[in-house]
Amino acid sequence: MTWHAKPSGGYSYTSAEGLDNIYEMAATMPAATLEAKAAVIANSVHEGGLNPWRWQGDRYGMSRGYGLFQYTPASGYINSGYPSIAPNLSTTEITAGASPSDGEAQCEVMASNYLGKWVSSCWRSYWSPTTYNSLYAYRGEVLRRWGSGSSISMQQFFGCQDLDAATFIFLACFEGPAVPNYDVRKKTAAKIYEILGGVIPVPPTPPDPPTPPVGSGIPFWLLKKIADKNNTKRLFDL
């Protein structure tokens, strides 16, 4: 495996370059659950498009977002003094000192919370609880199960074993986009999870037609007719 990067644009998670970067990102989080790894990577798909050199809107500017996680402002990451960073300072050419391995440095900065980006309340002040009421209610469930009731640490996140919850946690605690597009990121997380070797549970298929439960209020003669149609005597073997 090797890191890939380019001055502009992103990589599809099904492309050879995108897949290599997915595996490289996962390798930087050895202690995280598979669910947490998939959540981080899926969110980055919707941020920097799996391209470590990606500038927000494909326009260069230190006040803009940069990299896999769209560190904003870019200057916070680039001037952080973190060892081994190697950003590309252009959207049209490769600048001196730039290296695709900047992706690894970005992941290390994220995983160590080096820049203090983690918001443990798992919500953003610019997200209206009224507008996003169902998502706000889900936040409460997530914090009760995986956090400390009213907050969650990065260490607790890395131990999360629920893919949907992990995707929401990283979206809310680390990325914090203007619009919390959780549903689309959740779908991407399922794809990344499978790429990393996870198996998405398939809900059982109900009988066709469904067998009504005993005591459902349906007349006895109708229950018998349905049971006969399904070629079963389960309701009358008592």
Regions found by a protein language model. Give the residues of each.
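Extracellular cell-wall/glycan-interacting regions and their flexible linkers
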Residues: M1-A38, V179-L238
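Peptidoglycan-targeting cell-wall enzymes and recognition modules
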Residues: T2-P30, V45-D162
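Alpha-helical scaffolds flanking conserved acidic
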Residues: L34-A42, Q161-I169
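Charged, low-complexity, helix-prone segments enriched in Lys/Glu/Asp/Gln
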Residues: Q70, G81-E93, A178-L196
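Intrinsically disordered, low-complexity polar segments enriched in Ser/Thr/Pro and acidic
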Residues: Q106, T167, L235-L238
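Short, hydrophobic/amphipathic alpha-helical patches that form generic packing surfaces
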Residues: S112, I169-C173
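Residue microenvironments linked to proteolytic maturation
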Residues: F157, L163, F174-P180
